[in-house]
Amino acid sequence: MGARGNHTVDTSKQLAALRELMKKENVDVWVVPSEDQHYSEYLAHCDERRAFISGFNGSAGCAVITLDKAYLFTDGRYFLQAEKQLDSNWTLMKQGLPDVPTWQDFLHKTLDGSLKIGIDATIITEEDAAGLRKNLAPKKSELVPSKKNLVDIVWGSERPARPQNPVFHLDEKYSGQSFKEKVKKVREEIAKEKGKAFVVTMLDEVAWLFNLRGSDIDYNPVFFAYAVVTPDEVVLFINEKQLDDAARDYLGQDVKIRGYDELYDYLKELPKSLSLTGDKDGEKILVTSRTSLAITETITPPSSPESTTFHKVVRSPVGDLKAIKNAVEIEGFRQCHIRDGAALARYFAWLEEALNEGKEVSEYAGAEVLEKYRSELDLFRGLSFTTISSTGPNGAIIHYSPDPQDCAIIKKDQVYLCDSGAQFSDGTTDVTRTWHFGTPRPEEVRAFTRVLQGHIAIDTAVFPNGTTGYLIDSWARRSLWQDGLDYRHGTGHGVGHFLNVHEGPQGIGVRIAYNNTALKAGMTVSNEPGYYEDGQYGIRIENIVIVKEVKLPNNFGDKGYLGFEHVTMCPIQTKLIDASLLTEPEKKWVNDYHQEVWQKVSPLLQNDKRALEWLKRETTPI
């Protein structure tokens, strides 16, 4: 999501120091991806290497540094932010635009040949490394995986320490399933793949598997750990001091605890202890495509005979199981979104009144008030990402978030976009609403209405089992395309249950990965089409929806059919809707949705007359 601060950072000193190290290590290029050793999207501060070396702190991007140049690759969500943050040392590579290569293609297509390209082996996957090696070979360039991270050395004593915050047990009245039941299902999936073990590397998967939560990464209730599941044992690799007494008691004798740094020693011996032969058709240690090269080369050392491999890359059984919420989790999603809706109503009512009274409210101050209202809700555990509170042109910066020292004042005559969310013991929320507190311009109303039509198209979609989010993404864009408009981000991402607000493998968008995962009943995804006019405004309407089974008059092919249940409960501003563009079913959808919001949220606002009156007005039928 957003990242605080949009100032340019002078990176001359750190680049000079890095280049000196590169010369000592005999590498011509150093690659700095966004990810940490767990392939996390959002990072602990100690792992924000790309932000440290480049000054760009968006959540997606890759830095490529040569001995005389530096390049930052990122996607359309972050073009404007990167332009603001990068200094003159850097060239911004706008991935997705014509003739702009990916960073991987850049290394072998654009750079000279006969180069040594260095990267930390713990933050590149085996698959990516193999692809790079294959493409670099014709140019006689070489990938040099390193056991040390040169950026960490440059960062030195100023690098933040790795967090070791308390880890606690999430009660089964919220999780809906014991960790023993989850492990049993994982073992069944391991057996189907002729596996003898599965290495769990993703932090949200470790947390979900053991019904544990932490706070080692801001906004993400996870903790630094790995796990290995075999037919006979379950091992959790964690700093044991982080486990509180209740968590330790919950795991009991069923889980062996080893130090976080002991994983590699354990994996080195695992093929032997499992009596694996390494034969092509033999049993394997299962890993996912997001497992680091350092881990896979520990399991199957590069020195092994060519025909010998002790590991196999598979879809994560934990990720697939986690994506489908159980009945308890689904009910938690419904309830936490109703409570969240009350906080949103209180905030938007307060903000409107403040602006009408001529008070100055900065983007950051607004976000602080919204957090205050949320913090008063039952089961609140914190925000789920940095609030994107953006007025006018800042709304066009898709993942903008306000700098407390230097942000805009929210203006009545500008579009205001607010994308925010919270963590609760019973679920995770993520909601975007777009408002105008004055008189919107006709082009703003038309664009908003087109975005709304795309939102309704996804919300009301019906599709057969086996359909992917890749396939239905265009339904959200069709109405925008009719006006020659579009947006440079996905339509929806998976959402964790009191876990990461961005969850895979499910999603709605044009990423090829979304075509590999069919939408299934119980999955949770966002529905968030938008439109952004650079330098002027941004529009986005986002609800969280749950995939559900639907009963239809027919059932062609005996496939069974699916649809969506929206759980987000917050009005969509009717002032910004051109009702003449809507079909009758679309108008009915708006009115039905607003009636539902009123019925579910108004009982929670009986002690806030201002918010109650605001909600009544904003849910009036069109």
From Swiss-Prot:
One of its GO terms (biological process) is proteolysis. InterPro entries: Creatin/AminoP/Spt16_N, Creatinase/aminopeptidase-like, Creatinase_N, Pept_M24, Pept_M24B, Peptidase_M24_C, X-Pro_aminopeptidase_P. It catalyses: Release of any N-terminal amino acid, including proline, that is linked to proline, even from a dipeptide or tripeptide. Mn(2+) 2 binds at residues 419, 430, 542. Its cofactor is Mn(2+). Signal peptide: none annotated. The keyword Zinc-finger does not apply. The keyword Cell cycle does not apply. Binds 2 manganese ions per subunit. GO terms for molecular function: metal ion binding; metalloaminopeptidase activity. Its EC number is 3.4.11.9. Pfam families: Creatinase_N (PF01321), Creatinase_N_2 (PF16189), Peptidase_M24 (PF00557), Peptidase_M24_C (PF16188). Keywords: Aminopeptidase, Hydrolase, Manganese, Metal-binding, Metalloprotease, Protease. Mn(2+) 1 binds at residues 430, 528, 542. One of its GO terms (cellular component) is cytoplasm. It is an enzyme of class 3 (hydrolase). Catalyzes the removal of a penultimate prolyl residue from the N-termini of peptides. Belongs to the peptidase M24B family. This is Probable Xaa-Pro aminopeptidase P. It comes from Coprinopsis cinerea (strain Okayama-7 / 130 / ATCC MYA-4618 / FGSC 9003) (Inky cap fungus). The lineage of its organism: Eukaryota, Fungi, Dikarya, Basidiomycota, Agaricomycotina. The gene is AMPP.
